[in-house]
């Protein structure tokens, strides 16, 4: 454990940020899983609805630096391709 006051403060702040980021990451993954579940069920309308809910959340997390912007783009591209295959 840190002895210096500023190091103790950073440890507290880092733990707080870690918990916040974990919560946001979990929420984002849940939205992504909802899209995959709709695709697996073969329901294009539900998949599109879930995708439209997921997209701004993934973009927001990428903008804030929680995930890389290329990872966000990859998720969106892969899911869009799978939804379009449902037809």
Swiss-Prot record:
The keyword Ribonucleoprotein applies. Residues 1-26 are annotated as: Disordered. GO terms for cellular component: cytosol; small ribosomal subunit. Pfam families: Ribosomal_S20p. GO terms for biological process: translation. The keyword rRNA-binding applies. Keywords: Ribonucleoprotein, Ribosomal protein, RNA-binding, rRNA-binding. InterPro entries: Ribosomal_bS20 (IPR002583), Ribosomal_bS20_sf (IPR036510). Binds directly to 16S ribosomal RNA. Belongs to the bacterial ribosomal protein bS20 family. This is Small ribosomal subunit protein bS20.
